[in-house]
Amino acid sequence: MSAKEVRTRFAPSPTGYMHVGNLRTALYTYLIAKHENGKFILRIEDTDQGRYVEGAVDVIYKTLEMTGLKHDEGPDVGGPVGPYIQSERKGTYMEYAKELVEKGEAYYCFCDKERLDSLKENSDTFKYDGHCRNLSKEEVEENLKNGVPYVIRQKNPLDGVTTFEDEIYGTISVDNSELEDMILIKSDGLPTYNFANVVDDHLMGITHVVRGNEYLSSAPKYNRLYNAFGWDIPTYVHCPPIMKDAHNKLSKRNGDASFEDLLKKGYLKEAVVNFIALLGWNPGTNQEIFTLEELVKEFDYKNINKSPSIFDTTKLKWMNGEYIKKLSLDEFHKYALPYYEEIFTKEEMETYNLLKLSEQVQTRIEVFTEIPELVAFVKELPNYDISIYSHKKMKTNPENSLVTLEKALPALEALEDWTFDALNDVIYSLVKELEVKNGVVFWPVRTALSGEASSPGGAFELAEILGKKESLRRVRVGIEKLKEAIN
């Protein structure tokens, strides 16, 4: 490792799906490293075995791969400072915890669950009372010899002030009297999240630590550990919370969207990454659409805001729509096919011109889940009201629409080459024959084919999508509906 190399780490716990907040941490961590041509490390923090979810590590790997956040070191790719799974480093933490005990910066705590529970019952906000802080060396050795269960706690000063620097929130000072003697090693011998973080960040040469601002209150305790060991303190980048609305945080516990949920809701992964990048970071320009490569180039963590960010679904939809428009037709069609399969039978998939349908749908949706409802008219002609034949701008009404359809039917029946160009010629010939404006013919034909007031595509496109047989059937239905209503 180069002395000046920027090294960042994403250190998730394998507890389920990748929440939006976690993904933002991963993204910012990646961008900080890559902006400086540094290394992005993946570390799995599985010391809380009670929260471990089977398969969650694979979700982490898959999400990083899908989003393009490729890690340079990690459990699956190796590296010079492994292992990269905390449970595989168990012996390392105990060694460092004992060093702190020897330095008077930590102590063995033998308080049992019953005593700790009674403290919690008698206090609104639980804080360990330091009962074991000053046990004599002999008392400690006797308890250890007798196999009394213990944890190792950090020994924080009871007075004075601890000050630290954060790149987003500036200089922060905390009274030491507010610092709890947090547990470093649990009774099962595994480290706590807080202690393992500090030890691993040092041993792995981490230069920048990105996390949520809920960890600001823990930073003084982390710094006291760094100072106790004589280690360099990394650069802290504490990010503001992501809010569901003005009053509520986006929360995994409340069932708010995970990365997987957003994909299932019809969002493109590239759009999600772009959107999440802007949840707290301001590029300093009006640009809103960024590729990952552009983000690497432009990202400066000093432009992260202090104030919370609102997860604006309307904006995410808009952004996703912009990404959808940029897809090639073949790419879009590939994404659209599973949604067509939701409503069309195998036979219908082969009958209708779905590639043509995709061409019409692509510019009309913001998320892919809008497709089934938008194209439902293709599967089944809606039982529509003839009022939709009336259009002020097109100068149509039920009477002249009936004239148009009755003229159009034989012309369409006679058409052998059912292609866009041929359909175009027939319909335009009809316009000339009737000596009317285009809309007087286009609107009734489009309405008869779709059965809706608005549709993806006009008369020619819909006829091409539906095919000759179904198009003629729908024109006949339109004629019957209009005749019945007028007469």
Swiss-Prot record:
<comment type="similarity">
    <text>Belongs to the class-I aminoacyl-tRNA synthetase family. Glutamate--tRNA ligase type 1 subfamily.</text>
</comment>
<keyword id="KW-0547">Nucleotide-binding</keyword>
<dbReference type="Pfam" id="PF00749">
    <property type="entry name" value="tRNA-synt_1c"/>
</dbReference>
<dbReference type="InterPro" id="IPR049940">
    <property type="entry name" value="GluQ/Sye"/>
</dbReference>
<comment type="function">
    <text>Catalyzes the attachment of glutamate to tRNA(Glu) in a two-step reaction: glutamate is first activated by ATP to form Glu-AMP and then transferred to the acceptor end of tRNA(Glu).</text>
</comment>
<keyword id="KW-0648">Protein biosynthesis</keyword>
<dbReference type="InterPro" id="IPR004527">
    <property type="entry name" value="Glu-tRNA-ligase_bac/mito"/>
</dbReference>
<protein>
    <recommendedName>
        <fullName>Glutamate--tRNA ligase</fullName>
        <ecNumber>6.1.1.17</ecNumber>
    </recommendedName>
</protein>
<dbReference type="InterPro" id="IPR020058">
    <property type="entry name" value="Glu/Gln-tRNA-synth_Ib_cat-dom"/>
</dbReference>
<dbReference type="GO" id="GO:0008270">
    <property type="term" value="F:zinc ion binding"/>
</dbReference>
<dbReference type="InterPro" id="IPR033910">
    <property type="entry name" value="GluRS_core"/>
</dbReference>
<dbReference type="GO" id="GO:0000049">
    <property type="term" value="F:tRNA binding"/>
</dbReference>
<dbReference type="InterPro" id="IPR014729">
    <property type="entry name" value="Rossmann-like_a/b/a_fold"/>
</dbReference>
<comment type="subunit">
    <text>Monomer.</text>
</comment>
<keyword id="KW-0963">Cytoplasm</keyword>
<keyword id="KW-0067">ATP-binding</keyword>
<dbReference type="InterPro" id="IPR045462">
    <property type="entry name" value="aa-tRNA-synth_I_cd-bd"/>
</dbReference>
<dbReference type="GO" id="GO:0005829">
    <property type="term" value="C:cytosol"/>
</dbReference>
<dbReference type="GO" id="GO:0006424">
    <property type="term" value="P:glutamyl-tRNA aminoacylation"/>
</dbReference>
<feature type="binding site">
    <location>
        <position position="252"/>
    </location>
    <ligand>
        <name>ATP</name>
    </ligand>
</feature>
<feature type="short sequence motif" description="'HIGH' region">
    <location>
        <begin position="12"/>
        <end position="22"/>
    </location>
</feature>
<dbReference type="InterPro" id="IPR000924">
    <property type="entry name" value="Glu/Gln-tRNA-synth"/>
</dbReference>
<dbReference type="GO" id="GO:0004818">
    <property type="term" value="F:glutamate-tRNA ligase activity"/>
</dbReference>
<dbReference type="InterPro" id="IPR001412">
    <property type="entry name" value="aa-tRNA-synth_I_CS"/>
</dbReference>
<dbReference type="InterPro" id="IPR008925">
    <property type="entry name" value="aa_tRNA-synth_I_cd-bd_sf"/>
</dbReference>
<dbReference type="Pfam" id="PF19269">
    <property type="entry name" value="Anticodon_2"/>
</dbReference>
<feature type="short sequence motif" description="'KMSKS' region">
    <location>
        <begin position="249"/>
        <end position="253"/>
    </location>
</feature>
<keyword id="KW-0030">Aminoacyl-tRNA synthetase</keyword>
<keyword id="KW-0436">Ligase</keyword>
<dbReference type="InterPro" id="IPR020751">
    <property type="entry name" value="aa-tRNA-synth_I_codon-bd_sub2"/>
</dbReference>
<dbReference type="GO" id="GO:0005524">
    <property type="term" value="F:ATP binding"/>
</dbReference>
